[in-house]
């Protein structure tokens, strides 16, 4: 009987291990992340700040980067860069899935400003899921003054113009359009449909 219970326990542990998956959504400390279960691709955007400049009334330092990669089982390789930067400026790293909807990210070198906010090279940085969101991709705007539309036909534009580098959570893709939500630091949720041609390409 003991052997039977032990066997059941081991099987359950293995099932729990392999059933773990990355959850798309908003994580702690300024991380937004999306995971496409079909392709195994993970995309994300980290944006955090520290310090306070009394003269300008803004933060002194900022750490910002976009990343993408693929995940198999619980580990993945990512490439990170500032939205719009060229490929030679990218920094590789690793993403690893933890327990209880946590994950860690570690980069081979620091992005500008990150050392004063959060180091990603000394040790893996841990993030906890704050809110699950049904995103399959996170992408950014590559044009300037880009329109958002009311539907996937693109017949009626909203009174919104997105500047270059705006980061979006993508939930649905239909034809040449994607339904998206603008990721920013305000409580206002701006949603609409955007042309795929106005977004960074997914290799």
Give, region by region, the residue ranges found by the protein language model.
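Short, exposed beta-strand-loop hairpins at the edges of beta-sheets
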Residues: 183-189
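Central antiparallel beta-sheet cores of small beta-barrel/beta-sandwich binding domains
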Residues: 20-100, 106, 115-131
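Sec/Tat signal peptide C-region and signal peptidase I cleavage site
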Residues: 14-19
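Sec-dependent N-terminal signal peptides
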Residues: 3-13
